[in-house]
Amino acid sequence: MSKDEYLITDKPLKALTIFAMPMILGSFFQQVYNMADSIIVGQFVGSSALAAVGACAALTNVFICVALGAGVGAGVLVSRYFGARNYSKMKTIVSTSLISFCILSILLGAFGFGFSRLMMSLLQTPADILDEAVLYLQVYFVGFPFLFMYNILSTMFTSIGESKIPLGLLIFSSVLNIFMDLWMVADLGLGVFGAALATLIAQGVSAVFSFLIFLYRMRRYKCRYRWFDRQELQLMLRIAIPSVLQQSTVSIGMMIVQAVVNPFGTQALAGYAATMRVENVFSLMFVSIGNAVSPYVSQNLGANKTSRIKKGYRAALLLDTCFAALAFIVIETLHTQISSLFLGKDGTALAYQVSGDYMRWLGYFFIFMGIKMATAGVLRGLGIMRPFLIANMVNLAIRLSVALIFAPRFGIAFVWLAVPAGWLANFLISYAALRKSWPTDETERAVS
């Protein structure tokens, strides 16, 4: 057995822990990427500039989710072929997806750059921060192909059980991003433009190195393969499109929520933006475990070891419970200090109140996010995308309906009060579908 095959040979809890920890650390440094802009801009430029950067978050997440959803489609198939040791098909799907998504990323980047001002205006971005928000967004879209391709390559690495290489690259690029942020924002005084440019350069370096290392990594699998295969592309898109729709629709929903928050003013937006960054940091633990479960399930399905799938799911739930407890303790103890990292001395009482209330509410219910992510990860690994999509749409509908109906009338708190209910509904729908879809001996024979 190759050492790369530990996801189908080691004990499930051990395998998932070894696999997920570099992904969690990698996701942490991915958020450091994003947080560096916010913290440095907030400390050295001011809360208005922080609000400008934060106002872009919901929109940029839509485009990031297209990349993540596309990676899911390719990653599930790469994992399955890797588990079955069908390296010819594995390399074919890798090549096909990289060519297809490279073209897509360039088109999306051009679209985003050209329509930045229109999109931010439609989101009701406050007039006093609109120009800075548009500037940040346009620089972001110039570098979007790098971000897109890095996310695809990172998924490829994890699909073959290699999560340490993306971690190393993220640490390097995150450190580079922070130093360039400090230089361009604090020393050169380039403000929001400097923060966006620093991130663009760091993403570009990370994407190029990822491609070169992955190309070298693939050389160990000696086999013939096709550069582009339409049938494999169609198979990949059957999985990728529901995932893209799910993730993009959720992010579009968050854009609508952003539009609900914006009329409350710049300071409320600054507090909301600060906690959105914190939510992203804590949620990465649960997202990473869900992302680790998918290739674990897919590899074991491809290797005809379906009895390990349920054990892996239980192991993921255990890890999620531990991380939810940790998140609660940290937030309950340090929520004010965490808010001050973003808001600094310039933050008003309103900004701190919004940030603190939102953060503490999330801390009570992160366990719901954890169990829904683990369940969704199993569904993705099995290629069962319809209930996965439905569950996320219900989650979004609950969050949007409460925010749109109640927040304008009764206050900004209703933007986040419905979040745990959406997570719980998502889990219940996903789990009901999963109970009907556990692989059986017949599944093993069909896969083989």
Give the label of every model feature segment.
Residues 7-44, 58-73, 77, 102-109, ...:
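N-terminal transmembrane alpha-helices
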